[in-house]
Amino acid sequence: MTAVLDAWAALAFLRGEPAASRVKELILAEEALISSINLGEALYWTERRLGQRQAREEVDRLRPVLVVEDPDWPLVGVAAHLKAGGGLSYADAFCVATAQRHDATLYTGDPEILALDVPVEMVDLRAIS
């Protein structure tokens, strides 16, 4: 099984939120994949909270334990199509497109993503307490 994480999941892990335990399980099982776009989103949110240097240190500790996938042109096309449909950010479109590409389960707590009608299995991390 492959698990795709979005920025919401990465941030939950970095902040030690309740869903962090589930994200950690996925990482330890070597099943976790994240788009570099979504990891970048987690980086900028962390920088807003902690500053640039500390944010880089936090996210850099996460990078080696995840498979970080850079988008290629076909994936950009899928993400652009998802974004054109409305209802989600461009960065969010990349985690959905990445999950579609890998026929993977998407782990998120983002209500905009969870509300999508797309052929991707999703796990709502907000339900974990």
Predicted regions: what they are:
Residues 1-34, 47-60, 129:
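Short, well-structured N-terminal submotif of metal-dependent ribonuclease cores
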Residues 5-6, 34-36, 88-89, 110, ...:
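Histidine- and aromatic-rich ligand-binding microenvironments
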Residues 9-10, 38, 75, 95, ...:
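Alpha-helix capping/helix-boundary segments
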Residues 23-30, 62-63, 99, 113-117:
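Alpha-helix C-terminal capping segments
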Residues 24, 43-44, 63, 80:
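Amphipathic alpha-helical segments within well-ordered protein domains
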Residues 31, 67, 119-121:
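Conserved beta-strand segments of alpha/beta enzyme cores
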Residues 67-109:
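Active-site neighborhoods of divalent-metal-dependent phosphate/nucleic-acid chemistry enzymes
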Residues 96-129:
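Acidic, PIN/NYN-like endoribonuclease modules and their adjacent C-terminal/linker elements
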